[in-house]
Amino acid sequence: MNFSEKHTSLIVQGSQATEFLQGQITIDTEKISNEDFKPACICNNKGRVITTFWIKKVEIGFKIAILEELSASFEEHMNKYIPFFDAELKNDDQDHFKKELDSTEWMKFLINKGIVEINKNTSSKFTPHELNYQNNELIDFSKGCFNGQEVIARMEYRGNLKFALKIADNLQDEIKDSLIYNKEGKKVGEVLSLIHI
């Protein structure tokens, strides 16, 4: 899989790397293969997405591709829990991908998949449901507990979602701000990803 030039790579390794990640990330670590990267995220205890990333199995553990601007936030969150496991999180010494995409190509790929990649401006702001992650295989409700899982499960089974992700194209008006208002001046939406093609 190809990533943008804004991504960096981390490694999680150790005899309990799978168990450690299972309690933190939103997908089932038992279903992660070495064939290709899968999208996932970590959430805070309020069920808000701290960051998204892509993960796959490698010989020594798990390789994670993440936006460089959020790698420190990812490490800070994980380092609260990793001391309780025989696991280690470190920078990937072989931090390279098959072919780096430019930002426009990467954004086009994400929009076509219907995935919003969390960045510094959106970190800890949205729930997975507001980003439609439950329909894009970024959440596995059968895997058991993970950080923020109670809040997220409540939204899945009993919640009333006020906002949800939509993809729009052929917009007539030039977007000047990330916030969208109706004619009465009430906020009705927010642009999270935008590409001009």
Where are these regions (language model features)?
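Basic, glycine/lysine-rich polyanion-binding surfaces/domains
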Residues: 1-195
